[in-house]
Amino acid sequence: MGNRHAKERSHHHGFDADRDAKKLYKACKGMGTDEAAIIEVLSSRTSEERQQIKQKYKEKYGKDLEEVLNSELSGNFKKTALALLDRPNEYAARQLQKAMKGVGTDEAMLIEILCTRSNKEIVAIKEAYQRLFGRSLESDVKEDTSGNLRKILVSLLQASRDEEDTVDKELAGQDAKDLYDAGEGRWGTDELAFNEVLAKRSYKQLRATFQAYQILIGKDMEETIEEETSGDLKKAYLTIVRCAQDLEGYFADLLYKAMKGMGTDEETLIRIIVTRAEVDLQGIKAKFQEKYQKSLSDMVHSDTSGDFRKLLVALLH
């Protein structure tokens, strides 16, 4: 959906990579920077069009647009502009690498990205990771995580979630029973049974399984996971369950959490708005409005400032 909106905008006077490249060149040359022109071009083009603009810029001016913006801009505005110049899967790959490099691992980031993507997105992210860093994403994840979290992430990296649109009622009942036997129905939890179901079944099938579970046990799946698991594994399982139930709602909640209370988690705002822009951002906006009785644009507007605010708000329109 988001794609259609971006497309509509870029066609109101025809997309022209050459003209956009010139506009960006003019915005950055000489003293000072014309931020408004940069915002206008970056926010009104699709990801594919921005790739063409980058190419055109390099041909005409013999420079990488990223390098130019990197030296001209600063702060969160710069981060967002550079994120927009990456293909979404490259950007996700960079975020994963950042989550793992150096001391310590940002498990929450690994979970947010790997537990929310479709097979096709996972495959594209793995390819981008290999291309950008000359390493296998799977072996880096294996090295940087351990125990049951490692198992579920590696399962997800196989990109073997069923994508059939039909629901097998019998399988849902069987899976619900297996999940009961693996969790509530025994001492300790058998994570392999959870992984098998959570990483392999389609979202539609999972919803049927959670319903069957509710009927069988009289408890919802989230409650069981809260009781039976802990730490990062719990976070990963809950993320998959929430995404299966309502992917757009899951991202709406993350955005809300990034802004509510004191301080703002700008990194999360950038990551979600940029990566979901051409996937389901319109749906996320609608879900945000429904859940929190306020518009996402308004909340972003009151929680950010300057050119960063202008760029995010432009991306949300």
From Swiss-Prot:
Tell me which Pfam families the record gives.
Annexin
Q: Which GO MF term does the entry hold, naming one? A: phosphatidylserine binding
Q: Where in the cell is it found?
A: Apical cell membrane; Cell membrane; Cytoplasmic vesicle
Repeat (Annexin) residue spans along the chain:
15-86, 87-158, 170-242, 246-317
Q: Write the record's keywords in alphabetical order, separated by commas.
A: Annexin, Calcium, Calcium/phospholipid-binding, Cell membrane, Cytoplasmic vesicle, Lipoprotein, Membrane, Myristate, Repeat
One Gene Ontology cellular component annotation held by this UniProt entry? cytoplasmic vesicle
Q: Which InterPro entries match?
A: Annexin, Annexin_repeat, Annexin_repeat_CS, Annexin_sf, ANX13
Q: In which tissues is this gene expressed?
A: Detected on the tips of microvilli in small intestine (at protein level).
Q: How does it sit in the membrane?
A: Lipid-anchor
Covalent lipid adducts (N-myristoyl glycine), residues? 2
Q: How does it assemble?
A: Monomer and homodimer.
Q: What is known of its domains?
A: A pair of annexin repeats may form one binding site for calcium and phospholipid.
Its family?
Belongs to the annexin family.
Described purpose of this protein according to its UniProt entry: Binds to membranes enriched in phosphatidylserine or phosphatidylglycerol in a calcium-dependent manner. Half-maximal membrane binding requires about 60 uM calcium. Does not bind to membranes that lack phospholipids with an acidic headgroup.
Q: Which PANTHER family match?
A: ANNEXIN (PTHR10502), ANNEXIN A13 (PTHR10502:SF175)
Can you say what this protein is called? Annexin A13
Tell me what gene encodes this: Anxa13
